[in-house]
Amino acid sequence: MRVILLLAFLISLTECQWTSEDLALYDLVEEVGVNFYEWFDIPRDASSNQVKKAYRKLTLEWHPDRNSAPDATEKFRQVAGIYEVLKTTELREKYDNVLENGLPSWRHPMYYYRRMRKLAWYEGILVLLFIGTIAHYLMMWAAYFEKTLVYKQNVKKSRKSKKEDPAEAEKLMKQALEEYLPKYSELLPIILARGTVTLFKNLALTAKDAMTPKEVEPEEPTEEELAQQRRQQRAAAAPQQLEFKFEVAQGMKAVSTNDPEMEKKYAAENEVVAQKQSGATWTPDELASLVRLSTEKYPAGTPNRWEQMGRVLNRSAEDVIAMAGKMKQMKQEDYTKLLMTTIQQSVPVEEKSEDDWSQAEQKAFETALQKYPKGTDERWERISEEIGSKTKKQVMVRFKQLAEMIRKKKTNDT
């Protein structure tokens, strides 16, 4: 490559030294092949008028309309070119110099430049590649001999200091020089071909990657967002105390129905219940049912409210009214403790799902996210190993869930 650049630099210097008129003059002299003055039949010191007369005579002789010779057109063009040289004092002096000294020889850069100008672009590339290959091959041998001299000097120094065995040092030197020995696989055309193939492969892979839709990885949550997520999880995991609101009628009698048959039925049921349950102790289940019935199923204003609640509880309306009044006077803390056992027994315990994360697992997950940032090879496998109790799939699902929750929160905030 350095050789090719050097040749291009020399060619540019050559082009700057000679003008296009000089190059055209050299090409014309080489093409005509005869003395311009002899062809025009004039002396070397002929005047401009003599040159014009000779030019008119030759144009009439070689004009394609007057001369039917096959080379008439070519001769007519050469006559016009010679006239352009001889009529100009500067070009005429340069032509006289060519007559005395001749055209640039092979020792001169102009010789090669003039021939390069006549080649096609691909021919010029082949010539430069050939020259560059030879120069590159010679430079590889020069580098090899340079390394040889350096190693030989080191061997001599080791012999003088007696640090190494001479035979062993010679063997090591040969092994080291094998790396610098010129090889045909390192010639310039092979290097260029190999580089071109590698370039096209990389371009194909780049184009394939650009056309393949990539899965957008969600943004990683920040420390503040993770801390807020932990607080929300702890709040959701903490047992919540149920707040019971109830109303008890005071100074009122039970509402009775206007249906006589229903009144008789309710009266008979009340008597049975009163005989069976009057004065019995209320269980926590009955207390919970009483609160639920008084607030949800039979709220204030329901006809025959206390009688209907008594039928459900198998107690008389008076017992229901009395207990409701007592519960209204109880403190909220005592009331909550009284019902806590029943509530815990009534609520089914959910089995822990595989997707549930404990606080320890969540903390290990956040620590692993910081330890293996985005772009780490096999990131999700390493994070899964750090947690220990979660698979790669569960880790990825958890990450997407957190990112989605944070994204929704940002959207709601805005």
From Swiss-Prot:
GO terms for molecular function: DNA binding. Residues 211-234 are annotated as: Disordered. The keyword tRNA-binding does not apply. Keywords: DNA-binding, Membrane, Nucleus, Repeat, Signal, Transmembrane, Transmembrane helix. Residues 20-59, 274-320 form the Myb-like domain. InterPro entries: DnaJ_domain, DnaJ_domain_protein, Homeodomain-like_sf, J_dom_sf, SANT/Myb, SANT_dom. It holds the Pfam family DnaJ. This is Uncharacterized protein F54F2.9. PANTHER family: DNAJ HOMOLOG SUBFAMILY C MEMBER 1. It is found in: Nucleus membrane. It comes from Caenorhabditis elegans. The chain crosses the membrane at residues 125-145. Gene3D superfamilies: DnaJ domain, Homeodomain-like. The keyword Signal applies. GO terms for cellular component: endomembrane system; nuclear membrane. Residues 35-99 form the J domain. Its main location: nucleus. Residues 352-407 form the SANT domain. It is a single-pass membrane protein.
